[in-house]
């Protein structure tokens, strides 16, 4: 019996390449095919600041680009990252985010004579003083979508915004067009670029057959063939079929009576099954069958044979069709598995998902999902990169755009600039909504299809690690330690530095202020030196981590009243007491009032004070002075009674509150609460540093520094190894060396322009971004080499990978080697300019203000955008991943209060007063006097979405009543620690602050899903596999 590794289903051909799992035939010259070598640069640089990310794998032996879920030695399972690439192509930006909303449309010409269009949507951004701009640039090369922020005081013209979105455009003339017809033209033009329905051919082959004519003449079904068809889809009756028909006759049965149909992730697929199409004995070439399958871009060839049967390898060079570009050849490997090889015509770009080792699949739904996803990506890759398709599609799009320009340029109403932005008028907004109602195909219904079972196929999962109402924004963070279940982070806000310890299993957390320091821009934990490096507007300084941990332990474990007091994190949503009175927390399920506590080794983490409806109690107050302590306050219920808090190390703190009533625990913002209530102080966790202050050590000569990086010669941190610190100070690059507990300046190098970004490559070697270009600098020899230059773009970030460097200009990412030569044929086209980059095996993440993009390193395509909406529910603070379009663009992230209850993970929403009179709750942002009556949820900011959990079906039905300012206040701004976010064990931590709510998110690859077992007769090759993800 043949083994899986030496069976060839396809004969090698000069014009075709073959993917078979561990070998990429005819592709030995690919840059991704070079074996891994010891890392040249990044293992000791600050860009991998935890010094355990040396395995920045790009590829292993061709297409084996497994994620962090790779297989280790002795394991018999592989995980599959199954994702449709570039899903935003099916999320019509103009249809969903512009049409029916206030926006401007422009048409213009470039210096070279080409025409272009632009659509701009301006919104209030979550960060005060900034506007958010969504832009669509319609060029002859295609559609470019960008999302970015600009300062309100910045003087921006339409040309400035368009240049920001697409810097390479050299605009000669532009004008705003006020025409309802242009709304429809742009909507229709975008839809021509969207493909959500697919037709794939299915050919039956026998063991002794090798030609297409033999395949097309097969008629009889067999159990193996029927089993394969049933796995792929459902047999449907064509007569009166209402789904996507793929060119088949659904009225007169001229193309057969039945066919095979399926839908997956919102995409409809009709298979052209050769044995279900009409067969003519008199026609040896079966022209009627070829009329359908011959026009399909993707074909599946299934060999109906036993695993032991020898087959003649199929020769793809015998294909006669000009349309057939990708073939999936499948045969039974044994009773429970299939063997698959993918045949691709040369000239087509690479696409995923990547085949597993030996390409053996079990006969289950995972195989169906993988195969159809692979074929969907294959057809898209062929249309975009195969010359025969791409040239024709580009020419068609060019003709359509030029026709639109000619149509509206000749209109007398469009010959001049529109002075008052009439394209934002009510009439145009209503016209857009009417167009959406008339054509709902790409609206809510499609989104709902896309979201079906989406959580099962997410490559990356996002979870909220921490959320809190703070009056200070989280600026940056770094990781002390992290694993699957625990994490310790250092978090810097606008006012202070905190230490956050979390247990993901128990939900226990401790968020402790340790240093009061304003305006921290960036911080880095330098583990070999055991220091915390901090950048502020006054320059660089550092703290000894041992002192920080000692301070943290003193503050968090002392069983007596320490010099810091922390408000306990609530564990139960606040509810009303049906018997009257006001309780901190109430419960209908408990018979006696008690204190709910969460403990950890470092002390109490959260405490919820629970009062029972039947026993109205009050909590004895803690008496202390007015200075940063509780002022003789308590919570009283109408029926009296007392419950003592017997909980050591639980302390409450406020800022000099003025309590007008003995029934108030907290009083702030001059609020008056007649029957007792909870008023949050302006800072929900207040910590006063103890007498033993933490000493700060300044790094002389760094005032005005904007960027920095470091390298360490040895990961183990040997004392004799010198740590080098690189500092960008305006037009000067400074070098500091660690010497006896201090950073001492040893060299400086003047440059011709201000340093915008820098990336440590190796000891003494730095990649520096200045205006329009990146430089490679050897600071010891003072050698400056031009690495890569783009005259129309600004450098943003650089990231050192194994054997190559990722350079980001505005919204373009380019891979180069140390000589500046491109190492990859593709570019990363970010949807929003990244402020940070994170690298995990097989993927790179771009973190920007509005969203996080996950792109595959196989071809640069986007496979996921995250996180989706952050919302509050009565159970938890959740990431709403339900609707697929929210994963593509975080268009409306609203803080949501469901059923008048706050999440137990969101503590003390800013300026929230809760007064319970006669069992009624009031939620008010401005602190109203509440004497009872009705349930109120008052919010004076009504400019944005009020509910992030949008019912998209209702959205389509209610288009005429939409708020034109939808989304104005509900977009979250994401920031991350340092220049990247890659941390221990593949965990990525990102901070988000918006409207007083601060969150820390953990992103990790989904290791629970799509695990592909390998049969015992197919031993894996450990040498070709990435290391397993630690648990």
UniProtKB/Swiss-Prot annotation:
What is the disulfide pattern of this chain?
none
Q: Does the keyword Membrane apply?
A: no
Q: Where is the composition biased (Polar residues)?
A: 26-41
Question: A Pfam family this protein belongs to?
Answer: Rap_GAP
Top-level division of the source organism's lineage: Eukaryota
UniProt-listed InterPro entries: CNH_dom, Rap/Ran-GAP_sf, Rap/Ran_GAP_dom, Rap1_Ran_GAP
Give me the Gene Ontology terms describing cellular component: cytoplasm
List residues of the CNH domain. Answer: 471-881
BP terms from Gene Ontology: regulation of small GTPase mediated signal transduction
PANTHER family found in the cross-reference section:
GTPASE-ACTIVATING PROTEIN DDB_G0291510, RAP GTPASE-ACTIVATING PROTEIN
Q: Which UniProt keywords apply?
A: GTPase activation
In this chain the Rap-GAP domain maps to 186-404
Q: Which residues cross the membrane?
A: none
Q: What GO molecular function terms would the record report?
A: GTPase activator activity
Q: What is this protein called?
A: GTPase-activating protein DDB_G0291510
């Amino acid at each position: 019996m043949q083994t899986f590794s030496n069976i060839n289903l396809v004969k090698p051909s000069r014009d075709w390449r073959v993917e078979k799992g561990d070998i990429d035939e005819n592709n030995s010259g690919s840059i991704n095919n070079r074996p891994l070598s010891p890392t040249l640069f990044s293992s000791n640089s600050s860009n991998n600041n935890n010094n355990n990310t040396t395995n920045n794998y790009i590829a292993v032996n061709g297409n084996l680009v497994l994620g962090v879920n790779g297989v280790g030695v002795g394991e018999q399972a592989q995980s599959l990252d199954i994702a449709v690439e570039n899903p935003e192509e099916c999320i019509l930006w103009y249809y969903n985010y512009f049409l029916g909303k206030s926006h401007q449309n422009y048409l213009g010409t470039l210096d070279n004579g080409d025409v272009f269009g632009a659509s701009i949507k301006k919104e209030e951004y979550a960060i005060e003083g900034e506007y958010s701009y969504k832009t669509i640039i319609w060029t002859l090369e295609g559609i470019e979508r960008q999302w970015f922020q600009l300062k309100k005081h910045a003087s921006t013209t339409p040309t400035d915004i368009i240049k920001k979105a697409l810097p390479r455009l050299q605009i000669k003339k532009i004008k705003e067009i006020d025409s309802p017809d242009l709304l429809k033209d742009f909507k229709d033009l975008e839809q021509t670029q969207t493909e959500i329905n697919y037709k794939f051919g299915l050919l039956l082959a026998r063991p002794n057959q090798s030609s297409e004519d033999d395949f097309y003449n097969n008629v009889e079904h067999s159990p193996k063939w029927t089993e394969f068809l049933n796995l792929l889809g459902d047999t449907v009756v064509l007569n009166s079929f209402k789904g996507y028909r793929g060119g088949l006759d659904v009225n007169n049965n001229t193309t057969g009576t039945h066919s095979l149909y399926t839908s997956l992730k919102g995409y409809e697929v009709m298979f052209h099954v050769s044995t279900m199409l009409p067969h003519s004995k008199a026609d040896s070439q079966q022209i009627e069958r070829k009329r359908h399958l011959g026009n399909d871009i993707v074909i599946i060839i299934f060999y109906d044979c036993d695993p032991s049967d020898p087959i003649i390898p199929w020769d793809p060079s015998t294909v006669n069709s000009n349309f057939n570009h990708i073939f999936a050849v499948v045969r039974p490997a044994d009773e429970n598995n299939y063997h698959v090889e993918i045949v691709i015509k040369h000239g087509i770009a690479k696409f995923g998902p990547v085949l597993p080792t030996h390409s053996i699949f079990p006969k289950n739904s995972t195989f169906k999902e993988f195969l159809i996803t692979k074929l969907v990506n294959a057809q898209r890759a062929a249309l975009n990169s195969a010359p025969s398709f791409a040239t024709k599609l580009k020419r068609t799009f060019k003709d359509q755009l030029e026709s639109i320009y000619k149509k509206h340029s000749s209109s007398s109403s469009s010959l001049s600039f529109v002075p008052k932005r009439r394209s934002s008028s009510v009439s145009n907004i209503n016209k857009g909504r009417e167009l959406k109602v008339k054509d709902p195909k790409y609206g809510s219904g499609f989104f709902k299809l896309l979201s079906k079972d989406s959580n099962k196929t997410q490559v990356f999962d996002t979870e909220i690690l921490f959320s809190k109402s703070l009056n200070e924004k989280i600026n940056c963070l770094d990781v002390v330690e992290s694993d699957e279940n625990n994490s310790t982070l250092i978090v810097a806000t606008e006012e202070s530095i905190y230490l956050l310890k979390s247990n993901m299993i128990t939900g226990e957390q401790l968020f402790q202020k340790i240093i009061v320091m304003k305006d921290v821009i960036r911080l880095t934990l330098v583990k070999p030196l055991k220091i915390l490096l901090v950048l502020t507007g006054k320059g660089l300084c550092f703290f000894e981590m041992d002192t920080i941990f000692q301070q943290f332990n003193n503050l968090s474990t002392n069983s007596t009243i320490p010099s810091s007091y922390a408000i306990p994190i609530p564990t139960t949503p606040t509810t009303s007491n049906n018997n009257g009175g006001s309780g901190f927390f109430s419960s209908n399920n408990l018979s006696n009032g008690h204190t709910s506590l969460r403990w950890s080794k470092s002390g109490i983490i959260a405490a919820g004070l629970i009062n029972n409806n039947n026993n109205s109690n009050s909590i004895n107050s803690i008496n202390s002075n007015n200075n940063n302590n509780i002022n003789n306050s308590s919570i009283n219920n109408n029926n009296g009674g007392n419950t003592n808090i017997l909980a050591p190390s639980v302390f409450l703190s406020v800022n000099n509150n003025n309590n007008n009533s003995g029934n108030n625990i907290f009083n702030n913002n001059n609020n008056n609460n007649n029957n007792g209530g909870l008023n949050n102080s302006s800072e929900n966790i207040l910590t006063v540093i103890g007498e033993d202050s933490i000493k700060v050590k300044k790094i002389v000569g760094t005032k005005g520094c904007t960027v920095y990086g470091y390298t360490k010669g040895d990961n183990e941190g040997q004392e004799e190894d010198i740590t080098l610190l690189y500092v960008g100070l305006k037009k000067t690059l400074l070098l500091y060396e660690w010497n006896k507990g201090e950073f001492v300046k040893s060299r400086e190098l003047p440059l011709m322009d201000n340093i915008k970004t820098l990336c440590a490559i190796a000891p003494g070697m730095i990649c520096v971004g200045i205006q329009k270009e990146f430089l490679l600098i050897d600071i010891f020899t003072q050698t400056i080499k031009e690495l890569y230059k783009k005259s129309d773009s600004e450098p943003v970030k650089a990231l050192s990978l194994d054997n190559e460097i990722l350079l980001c200009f505005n919204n373009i990412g380019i891979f180069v080697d140390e000589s500046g030569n491109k190492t990859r044929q593709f570019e990363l086209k970010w949807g929003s300019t990244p402020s940070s980059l994170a690298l995990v095996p097989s993927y790179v993440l771009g973190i920007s203000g509005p969203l996080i993009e996950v792109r595959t390193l196989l071809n640069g395509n986007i496979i996921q955008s995250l996180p989706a909406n952050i919302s509050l529910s009565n159970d938890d603070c959740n990431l709403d991943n339900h609707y697929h379009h929210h994963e593509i663009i975080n268009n409306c992230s609203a803080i949501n209060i469901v059923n008048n209850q706050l999440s137990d993970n969101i503590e003390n929403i800013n300026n929230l007063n809760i007064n319970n009179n006669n069992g009624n709750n009031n939620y008010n942002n401005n602190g109203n006097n509440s004497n009872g009556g009705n349930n109120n949820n008052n919010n004076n900011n009504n400019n944005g979405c009020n509910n992030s959990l949008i019912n998209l079906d209702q959205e389509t039905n209610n288009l005429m009543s939409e708020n034109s300012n939808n989304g104005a206040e509900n977009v979250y701004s994401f920031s991350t620690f340092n220049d990247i976010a890659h941390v221990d064990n593949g965990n990525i931590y990102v901070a988000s602050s918006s409207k007083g709510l601060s969150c820390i998110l953990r992103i990790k690859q989904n290791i629970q899903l799509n695990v592909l077992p390998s049969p015992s007769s197919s031993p894996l090759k450990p040498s070709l596999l990435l290391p397993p993800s630690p648990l």
